[in-house]
Curated annotation (Swiss-Prot):
Keywords: Acetylation, Disease variant, DNA-binding, Intellectual disability, Isopeptide bond, Metal-binding, Nucleus, Phosphoprotein, Repeat, Transcription, Transcription regulation, Ubl conjugation, Zinc, Zinc-finger. It is linked to Neurodevelopmental disorder with poor growth, large ears, and dysmorphic facies: An autosomal recessive neurodevelopmental disorder characterized by severe global developmental delay, brain malformation, microcephaly, growth deficiency, and distinct facial dysmorphism. Disease severity is variable and death in infancy may occur. It is found in: Nucleus. The modification N-acetylmethionine is found at residue 1. The modification Phosphoserine is found at residues 10, 387. SMART domains: ZnF_C2H2. This is Zinc finger protein 668. Residues 34-79, 492-513 are annotated as: Disordered. It comes from the Eukaryota. It comes from Homo sapiens (Human). Changing residue 331 to R: In a breast cancer sample; somatic mutation. Changing residue 556 to Q: In a breast cancer sample; somatic mutation. One of its GO terms (biological process) is DNA repair. Its main location: nucleus.
């Protein structure tokens, strides 16, 4: 009882009462009660506290911050022994409880749950600060924005985002930080301490919580939901940044151009556009980048890594954003809407490109022929007409194509033929796309180096007795001419190019098996026209419906072309008259109505011409 009375009358040696807290006389640490202060004071040893107090001087702010961030504070005038070393990192501590508390940063253990919301914390002091937010106790308010905090330390870290202060500098790379916890995490990257690795892609992290956040990119889990628009996120920080869009908050403003940003990282990347700084260098190709996300995306292109997997179709992607945008193809979500024609798009850049159609801007001009385009991709495709480039090759037959969509359509013919057991049709290899509509008697191909005169009808796959019958649809592919369909009121279906075109009669042609197979029910047809007419009965083969009239199409290009009939958009303008058309093929047909100057020779079009053979000719 006498000991207790003595403790009540005066504090134990090694600490003193300062207001409502107890302050250590050796290191200036404070504690909420006397027992904790006494236990802490015992770690300094039985030194004369009065002499230590005289030696303790206030440290400069920058030195104190660096010590706070590194966890290497010095007690008194000399460093005290730290016998408890962490086996996972270079840190050491004076007591076993301090080491156990530090170990939670490696294991991710959070033994202190919030009774209100269930959120868990590593330290009890963090839980107390969090509980103040539930009680509405946020006494520390930012003077620059409406945010408030329950702890003064959090407010100071937040205010550095407004002032640009970054007092924690890395001695290895010079990078600076505003938050000491982020600085500590960064230092582990130099030490090579990344004990938490992803089982799917092998990526390693220094913190368990970072691994948990990364794993959501593989599983697609997005537990953080925006109450305003319903959009979900995989990280709480992403939700916080997103909510600033609804609140019209852009706390990070560029002093050079006045542009505002919702995220500090976006603001820092924007600053480099003014300075021209590109600090991220690719060691493989030497290319430099101004922001780390572009640099990481570029590195995956070198490595060929596509860790983000679509569960519905099995397609892989390099970026989680690419996977999220791809999923809209399955869900039908098209959140970006044109205000002028109500057309919707999957991605924002598709809407921006579409807006050029309404504005009439065509900034990309061909240097060869002067034709202008609204998109750079359209100019790139058009330039292949002049260069002859056909970069998309079929792995099955070796054919090459100007655009990837033509390759995909061609590959469907292989799949349908394989499903029906029909061998691929033979094709005639020629060097030029010869004019259609000429007829001859011989069926032999011209010898190499011979003069290019009128090709015989048999060479083009027409029956010898057809005379001037026109093949109205031909497809020019690679170095072959493939007969697609021959239509004439009084002429039967034309045989293939190598099916004995010079033989008398049509007995073998009558016995020719059907070549056009339905992809859904495997029924066969003698012409492509009959097949297309039949496939309309299978809605599964037409997965792209028009939202205005309900008509369905087998591919997205057909739907896009059809949707123009509901709007006033006519993107293909005739250079000779004011008329405009829905499609490029309609424009080409119309251009033939304009007279050609007399004496102009009709050159043989190279086989690499994008438009192929003309659809009409002299009978």
């Amino acid at each position: 009882m006498e000991v207790e009375a003595a403790e009540a009358r005066s504090p134990a040696p090694g600490y003193k009462r300062s207001g409502r807290r107890y302050k250590c006389l050796s290191c200036t640490k404070t504690f909420p009660n006397a027992p904790r202060a006494a236990r802490h004071a015992a770690t300094h040893g039985p030194a004369d506290c009065s002499e230590e107090v005289a030696e303790v001087k206030p440290k400069p702010e920058t030195e104190a911050k660096a010590e706070e961030a590194s966890g290497e504070k010095v007690s008194g005038s000399a460093a005290k022994p730290r016998p408890y070393a962490c086996p996972l990192c270079p840190k050491a501590y004076k007591t076993a409880p301090e080491l156990r508390s530090h170990g939670r940063s490696h294991t991710g253990e959070k033994p202190f749950p919030c009774p209100e919301c269930g959120r868990r914390f590593m330290q009890p002091v963090c839980l107390r600060v969090h509980l103040a937010s539930h009680a509405g106790e946020l006494p520390f308010r930012c003077a620059h924005c409406p945010k408030a905090y329950g702890a003064l330390s959090k407010l100071k870290i937040h205010q550095r985002g407004h002032t640009g202060e970054r007092p924690y500098a890395c001695a290895d790379c010079g990078k600076s930080f505003a938050d000491p916890s982020v600085f500590r995490k960064h230092r582990r990257t130099h030490a090579g301490l990344r004990p938490y690795s992803c089982e799917r892609c092998g990526k390693a992290y220094a913190e368990l919580k970072d691994l948990r956040n990364h794993e959501r990119s593989h599983t697609g889990e997005r537990p953080f939901l925006c109450s305003e628009c319903g959009k979900s996120f995989s990280r709480s920080s992403s939700l916080t940044c997103h909510q600033r869009i609804h609140a019209a908050q852009k706390p990070y403003r560029c002093p050079a151009c006045g542009k505002g940003f919702t995220q500090l990282s976006s603001y820092q990347s924007h600053e480099r556009t003014h300075s021209g700084e590109k600090p991220f260098l690719c060691p493989r190709c030497g290319r430099m980048f101004s922001d780390p996300s572009s640099f990481r995306r570029h590195q995956r292109a070198h490595e060929g890594v596509k860790p983000y997997h679509c569960e519905k179709c099995g397609k892989d992607f390099r970026q989680p954003a690419d996977l999220a945008m791809h999923r809209r193809v399955h869900t039908g979500d098209r959140p970006f809407k044109c205000l002028q024609c109500d057309k919707t798009f999957v991605a924002s850049w598709d809407l921006k490109r579409h807006a050029l159609v309404h504005s009439g801007q065509r900034p990309f001009r061909c240097e060869e022929c002067g034709r202008a385009f609204a998109e750079r991709a359209s100019l790139t495709k058009h330039s292949r007409v002049h260069s002859g480039e056909r970069p998309f090759h079929c792995n099955a037959c070796g054919k090459s194509f100007v655009v990837s969509s033509s390759l995909r359509k061609h590959e469907r013919t292989h799949r349908s033929s394989e499903a029906a057991g029909v061998p691929p049709a033979q094709e005639l290899v020629v060097g030029l796309a010869l004019p259609v509509g000429v007829a001859g008697e011989s069926s032999a191909a011209p010898a190499a180096g011979a003069g290019l005169g009128d090709p015989p009808a048999g060479l083009l796959g027409l029956p010898p007795e057809s005379g001037g019958v026109m093949a109205t649809q031909w497809q020019v592919v690679g170095m072959t001419v493939e007969h697609v369909e021959c239509q004439d009121a009084g002429v039967r279906e034309a045989p293939g190019p190598l099916e004995g075109a010079g033989e008398a009669g049509g007995e073998e042609a009558d016995e020719k098996p059907p070549q056009f197979v339905c992809r859904e029910c495997k029924e066969t047809f003698s012409t492509m026209t009959l097949l297309r007419r039949h496939e309309r009965s299978h809605p599964e083969l037409r997965p792209f419906p028009c939202t205005q009239c309900g008509k369905s199409f087998s591919d997205r290009a057909g739907l896009r072309k059809h949707s123009r009939t509901h709007s006033s958009v006519r993107p293909y303008t005739c250079p000779h008259c004011p008329k405009a058309f829905l499609s490029a093929s309609d424009l080409r047909k119309h251009e033939r109505t304009h007279p050609v100057p007399m004496g102009t020779p009709t050159p043989l079009e190279p086989l690499v011409a994008l438009l192929g053979m003309p659809e009409e000719g002299p009978a």
